[in-house]
From Swiss-Prot:
PANTHER family in alphabetical order: ENDORIBONUCLEASE YBEY, CHLOROPLASTIC
UniProt cross-references to NCBIfam families, sorted A to Z: rRNA maturation RNase YbeY
UniProt organism field: Granulibacter bethesdensis (strain ATCC BAA-1260 / CGDNIH1)
InterPro entries: MetalPrtase_cat_dom_sf_prd (IPR023091), YbeY (IPR002036)
Region of interest: Disordered: 1-26
GO CC field: cytoplasm
Residues reported in the UniProt entry to bind Zn(2+): H137, H141, H147
Keyword Flavoprotein attached: no
Protein's name according to its UniProt entry: Endoribonuclease YbeY
Top-level EC class as recorded in UniProt: hydrolase
Gene coding for it: ybeY
Biological process according to GO: rRNA processing
Amino acid sequence: MDPASSPNPASASFAPAGFPSDTDEDGVSPGYIVPEIIVTEPAWRRHIPHADRLIRRVARAAGSTADCVVLSCDRDVRRLNARHRGKDKPTNVLTFEPVGMPGAEGGEIVLALGVVLREAKAARKRPVHHLAHLLVHGVLHLHGHDHHHAGDARRMEAEEARIMRSLGMPNPWKRS
């Protein structure tokens, strides 16, 4: 995907950081989309050094359809959140379906480093575990999951916990 020509809001102004392989070590398509990883906030590498590996692990475990994961900063996520959701504040994760193709595979997940770190600290969680949870959360949104109603929220939380368990990570909904 060429972010400069992308109609999607998150990658439209960002330069690519690299293109991971779309096959596994045996040359077989893995059954999930290996997302392009764009790092627009270099501090991600300091706080979560192997975020790229984690993104690929989560993509595999969650059956990701995301074309792109953007590791961004609070300022840029705040702008996106204001423009697309009318909320003038940063949020932890935003997801964008493919433009003009509701229900189609693909889409983007954008994360704000400052929010992710503050939330992890407040919840006494390791930042890598919180990032994994937010990636799973974003993938589930791209799969059509929602949490606007209590029943939907419970189902989404249960699926998040199941995927996190498959990754060998703690249930994000249990207090430690």
